[in-house]
Amino acid sequence: LYFKDDDSRLSFLQGNYITLTNMSDDDVDRIIRYHLEPINISFHTTNPELRCKMLHNRFAGEALKKIDRLYEGGITMNGQIVLCKGVNDGEELERSIRDMMKYLPCLQSVSVVPVGLTKYREGLYPLESFTKEDAKEVLSIIHKWQKKAYDEYGYHFIHAGDEWYILAEEEMPEEERYDGYLQLENGVGMMRLLQNEFAEEYAGLEGDDTEREVSIATGVLAYPLICKMASAIEKKYTKTKIHVYGIRN
């Protein structure tokens, strides 16, 4: 068995995202020849110099040319951009989305998610958390390009991670905007799917008077939604008490 973080075989087999930095021309030829798809690509930016900096790899910018070959070979692709404040957001994000649009329809979806930050960052690049205003700006950019993609190709193409809507205190898009949840494992549409599935199941519950006490642990971002669902359950199951705990990473 051969496992490697940037192994293209794990991309189409298991959905791993790869940067293409260690992919040879032979690898690209094999993908095209056997039509191994979809290939999931970590773009992060289409600015070659910035990509080298972000990935700490001098070949990262040159690797973007491999996407041209995959596109010419008709290979279905998905992409992701992990957004870092002051690095690849703003005008750089606009540039990246504009550049990626040329790969439609082979590039069927791209997710934009905020970089995950924890308190354990000693010796790492100094990154800041996004604010509510930042999130609104990111959503504004994404919604603009969504409309353009939908008008031209009939699908939304570029998708914002759920965190942006929560941070911006905006409603999650309706299910149709997610194009079949192509980026679900990247945290795109999870909250909408959960809300819809909960509503469907909840409508069929009759409730009872059995005494229960339940504890649920969840992340800070999902905490308000889980609390809302727990409250709804308690109203139907009057002797059930649900404790929801938001865990900060």
Question: What are these model-predicted stretches?
Answer:
Residues 102-103, 117-249:
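Auxiliary Fe-S-binding modules of radical SAM enzymes
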Residues 1-106, 116-144:
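Conserved Radical SAM active-site core
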Residues 42, 113, 161:
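Conserved residues at the C-terminal ends of beta-strands
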